[in-house]
Amino acid sequence: MTYTRYERARIVGARALQISMGAPVLVKTVKIDPLDIALEEFDADRVPITVKRQFGTCSEVL
């Protein structure tokens, strides 16, 4: 999936916040920093967050 840098930052930041609040981690890792874990999940395409883009009158869900 291709995301803009802004979408990527929003997804990783939101997931890092979820992890820091106690959400289960979806990849096996030895890291303890929520941001590093969120980046690993994003790179492994395991982040349970969707992006809704709007193009004119249509919308696309990624």
UniProtKB/Swiss-Prot annotation:
It is an enzyme of class 2 (transferase). Its EC number is 2.7.7.6. Gene3D superfamilies: 3.90.940.10. The keyword Ubl conjugation does not apply. The keyword Cytoplasm applies. Signal peptide: none annotated. It comes from the Archaea. NCBIfam families: PRK01099.1-3. This is DNA-directed RNA polymerase subunit Rpo6. The lineage of its organism: Archaea, Methanobacteriati, Methanobacteriota, Stenosarchaea group, Methanomicrobia. The gene is rpo6.
